[in-house]
Amino acid sequence: MRQNGLSLSISIKHIIMINNYSLSDISSQVRRDIVRMVNMAASGHPGGSLSSTDILTVLFFSEMNHDPKVWRRDGKGKDMFFLSAGHLSPVFYSVLARSGYFPVSELASFRKQGSRLQGHPSVERGLPGVHVASGSLGQGLSVACGAAITKRLSGEENFVYVLCGDGESEEGQIWEAAMFAAHNKLSRLIAITDWNGQQIDGPTDSVMSLGDLEAKWKAFGWEVIVADGHDLDAISAAYKQAKAGSQNGKPKMILMKTHMGMNVDFMQGTHHWHGKAPNADQTANALSQLKETIGDF
């Protein structure tokens, strides 16, 4: 994978700045952003944001057709991304800012009163990159289905991406949307599950087992791709495979195997950091494990 050959859909000025960094560099900086944002706000969800960092870094900086400088809320003429697991807003905001949708300095306003960067993404204050407010868990896949149908009816051949959580997949609306997408042959819909095995109350297998998740999605009529959600090459290959099947009549589900709190040793692999802000000492510890590459906000 050409880790320095970042998406040409991003504005030329921004490419000149960001192209000096590999996807690994960007991913490390995004993780630092997440830790600092949640610490500064004394609130937020670091665990799942850290587990999905590599997934969104590859998508926004390598695989998705988007342009921050000509962004439209209706997504016309470009790929669209929806964050169904809205509590993962720290990673979403960081990736948007680092992509050039809004100033990186604005990350410091996360969860502040009057900020455009609320705990769950909203459209009230017109934050570029956010097409729709995140609702209750389970709703985003349905929204993405609607966007995919709209693009088909409009004659567009762009892709629609949506990120869901594995805990979120316990919601019934996910499976209603799964049936809808398969029935309507939404082959340009690419859903991603951050499969970290943890949710707010504990391991997903203990709270409510999803069983054989791969077999389940296949049984619902989806093409299923399983990948290591922390291997940048594997993530890129998964996206490419999903896009290559755009004419096969099947929606795509990429099951990304990840670790909650990835790359921060005391957060990694435990549900205790699902929605907990690190204190000053914990933040310093976490940042010592994450290389500053592009520069902190």
Model-found features: residue ranges?
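Glycine-rich beta-alpha junction loops
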Residues: 54, 87-88, 196-197, 257-261
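N-terminal capping segment at the start of a domain
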Residues: 27-43, 194-196
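Glycine/aspartate-rich loop-and-adjacent alpha/beta segment that forms the canonical ThDP
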Residues: 232, 238-297
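Thiamine diphosphate
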Residues: 127-129, 133-136, 141-245
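Short, Lys/Arg-enriched N-terminal segments with co-localized hydrophobic residues
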Residues: 4-16
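Generic beta-sheet signal
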Residues: 79-81, 158-162, 189, 248-256
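Cofactor-binding active-site loop characterized by glycine-rich and histidine/acidic residues
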Residues: 34-38, 49-183
